[in-house]
């Protein structure tokens, strides 16, 4: 007996409100669902195509589609003869151990290049590939990751698979091995390798400064090799800190490309593309699970935060469809029903997550104006508490997804705004 599929009521195989990153190798979240951003897409591709080596940065608020844009750019570049892979390389800046060193970041870049070589040329062989395999295997074994066989990757973890590579070998040999792998790539007819560095979304200010130091530490060793094209992705403040703090790094990076939210028409097209791709019965039309007014209102509340908007649609519609019995087709969910469901749900979740004090302060903010921008000085006056208490509460609200800090403007005070998730609770 098949399990019930609530989305089948709209002739859809599964939820169209997924948040998974679009990938070239995925049948459920394929890249052809990407919409909009043609200008930004062309700018990134032109920079890659106009140089033997490039370093770019894509910035913007959380949830507006930065990662998906870069995944699409990598796929575009691949059709033009560049090598890449769907993997995203994280920049880690926390801790005083291996993960907080330039050597670790160098190892991640080397692993990314090696993965791209194997992804595009599974039969790759030769001294350059063997040297890369040995270093990458050593890196992954020390980090508790995967081992590498002569024919690719495996999930083994035994000591017999280990390679005796001294910890300092990465700093000594890594840059040479990286350069040789890139030369091998060019020798195989590729125009270069495009790597996607991510994980700047949630870096604290201190972590972003540390990441800037790490990037500076490998500038000459790794960033400037012919054939290597890097795209760093993260929030506006994090990206600016990471790539513009040090002159040595800023001088070799293009100015960050700061993304604005997708327009409403593009968001509506994005949803239509998903409905069509998930059509269950090709002999019958699909139906939108929500009325147009729902999309318009949530777009206004979330101000272009697609991640938050899709989650709100998923949560609200799933709750409402759970009350629907299988049978005849159901009408799209209306605005009033969805907003009421999300208000009750978000209120309960935030109250439980925040506790009484932080919830009461968020409520006081909402009673003044849930859409208003606030500074810490304004919140000191509103909440009638001292600045350290305001700072602590804001951190709690940010971690709960109720508030976000807007990008800095020079030396002006940081501005804070309620997220769509919090505004739905009021």
PLM features: residue spans?
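Winged-helix-like regulatory helical subdomains adjacent to P-loop NTPase cores
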Residues: 304, 308-378
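Conserved AAA+ ATPase small/helical "lid" subdomain
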Residues: 130-138, 275-329
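The catalytic "switch" region of P-loop NTPases
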Residues: 2-12, 176, 180-295
């Amino acid at each position: 007996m098949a399990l019930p599929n609530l989305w089948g009521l709209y002739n859809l195989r599964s939820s169209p409100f997924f948040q998974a990153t679009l990938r070239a190798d995925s049948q459920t979240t394929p890249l052809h669902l990407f919409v909009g951003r043609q200008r930004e897409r062309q700018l990134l591709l032109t920079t890659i195509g106009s140089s033997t080596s490039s370093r770019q940065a894509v910035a913007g608020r959380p949830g507006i589609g930065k990662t998906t844009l870069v995944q699409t750019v990598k796929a575009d570049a691949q059709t033009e003869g560049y090598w890449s892979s769907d993997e995203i390389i994280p920049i880690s800046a926390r801790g005083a151990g291996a993960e907080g060193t330039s050597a670790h970041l160098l190892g991640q870049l080397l692993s990314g290049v090696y993965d791209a070589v194997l992804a595009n040329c599974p039969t790759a062989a030769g001294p350059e590939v063997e040297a890369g395999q040995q270093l990458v295997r050593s890196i992954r074994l020390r980090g508790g990751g995967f081992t590498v066989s002569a024919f690719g990757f495996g999930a083994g973890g035994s000591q017999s698979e280990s390679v005796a590579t001294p910890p300092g070998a990465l700093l000594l040999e890594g840059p040479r091995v990286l350069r040789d792998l890139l030369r091998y790539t060019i020798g195989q007819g590729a125009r270069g390798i495009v790597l996607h560095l991510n994980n700047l979304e949630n870096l604290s200010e201190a972590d972003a400064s540390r990441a800037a130091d790490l990037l500076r530490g490998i500038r000459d060793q790794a960033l400037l090799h012919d054939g290597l094209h890097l795209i760093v992705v993260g929030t506006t403040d994090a990206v600016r800190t990471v790539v513009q703090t040090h002159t040595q790094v800023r001088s070799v990076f293009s100015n960050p490309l700061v993304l604005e939210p997708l327009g409403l028409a593009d968001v509506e097209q994005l949803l239509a593309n998903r409905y069509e791709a998930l059509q269950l019965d090709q002999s019958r039309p699909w139906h939108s699970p929500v009325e147009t007014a729902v999309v318009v209102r949530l777009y206004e509340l979330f101000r272009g935060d697609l991640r938050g908007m899709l989650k709100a649609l998923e949560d609200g519609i799933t709750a409402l469809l759970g009350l629907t019995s299988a049978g005849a087709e159901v009408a799209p969910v209306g605005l009033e029903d969805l907003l009421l469901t999300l208000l009750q749900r978000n209120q309960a979740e935030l109250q439980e997550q925040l506790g009484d004090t932080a919830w009461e302060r968020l409520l006081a903010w909402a009673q003044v104006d849930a859409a208003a921008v606030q500074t810490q000085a304004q919140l000191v006056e509103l909440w009638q508490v001292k600045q350290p208490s305001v700072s602590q509460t804001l951190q709690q609200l940010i971690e709960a997804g109720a508030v976000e800090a807007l990008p800095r403007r020079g030396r002006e005070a940081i501005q804070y705004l309620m997220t769509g998730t919090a505004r739905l609770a009021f």
